[in-house]
Amino acid sequence: MSRLREEQRAGPVGQSVSLADLPLREDLRGKSPYGAPQLDVPVRLNTNENPHPPTQALVDDVTASVHAVAGELHRYPDRDAVALRTDLAAYLTSQTGTPLSVENLWAANGSNEILQQLLQAFGGPGRSAIGFVPSYSMHPIISDGTQTAWLVANRADDFSLDAQVAAAAIRERNPDIVFVASPNNPSGQSVPLDALRKLLDTMSTGILILDEAYGEFSSEPSAVKLIDEYPAKLVVTRTMSKAFAFAGGRLGYLIAAPAVIDAVLLVRLPYHLSSITQAAARAALRHADDTLGSVAKLIAERDRVTEALTGMGFRVIPSDANFVLFGEFADAPATWRRYLDAGILIRDVGIPGYLRATTGLAEENDVLLGTSARLAETELTRPIPSVP
């Protein structure tokens, strides 16, 4: 056997060292990385993607746009992504009715990088961030990564955000950063603007990061409308990974007062957005009307799934996003496995008794509902008796 084959058979170089052997920061020991299961199954409803593929016109535009910049790949991209940010400002001005300019926008590789940059600029050692749980699991992970102390306040029993209770928690803890997701992931509820005003008025210092990753699905107006009212306190983050069907393109952005963008520029890495990403995202924005045409279809499907699951005896949390949180299961992890055994991948988000399912294509949702009808007879805390 050759030496190369012996090495391949023995395993990767350096495997004798474990994570415990490394000089890792003490505050990161024992932590777990983010990760939704990536499994090859017939029905994948676990990562809240838009199930509708891009149109051929969009594919052709992305291909042509990338081809146009390919000849310049030996050069660094536009460091500040001015053209892309200008296009994003135009899109949001049209969608929200709030006049925005390039100075109000910043873009990065997914909204998680946006959140990380915000925590680098406004969080860090000696500072704190508060979240209202259950909510997006990356908020505490990014806080840990930037050595920002993570504080927790609970949502109501129905997972909604009680503005009065949340304001009291802010008043008591006085965090430097307040995280609010609207619609909330994993429960799906939106937060009305009046409730956000209550939180912002309570804050004596710091910023409120309003995570609108699922904003295009929401029945509530965007908090972008409040930026001019609270320019030193409010930052709105969004993504093209959900409604925009651009998850593979990895493009997130924030909307804020120009001074906030100036702050982020202090911590961003140079040339962080590739020429290819910028070109592809601009092409996607040119086809916004066609792509977002699927939003109404997904909302209708979400409502159909909600009604059907409710009729089967499940408790379904009313959702303003492209997913539903449902239960109440006697053993959610075990039920998650039974869905997987049936070829359906949904998400165990760590809430006892509940699982989350993305709204898929009609035929995918039919498979989910068929399996759910069978599981309702055995998996719920109060199983529905089978009909003879």
Residues covered by each model-derived region:
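PLP-dependent enzyme catalytic core of the Aspartate aminotransferase-like
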Residues: 2-3, 194, 334, 338-342, ...
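N-terminal small-domain helix-loop-helix segment of the aminotransferase-like
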Residues: 6, 14-110, 117
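Short Gly/Ser/Thr- and Asp/Glu-enriched loop/turn motifs at secondary-structure junctions
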Residues: 40, 102, 317-323, 350-354
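Short beta-strands and strand-loop turn motifs
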Residues: 46, 150-154, 176-183, 208-211, ...
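PLP-dependent aminotransferase class I/II
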Residues: 55, 233-310, 314-317
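Conserved PLP-binding catalytic core of the aspartate aminotransferase-like
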Residues: 298-299, 307-342, 359, 386-388
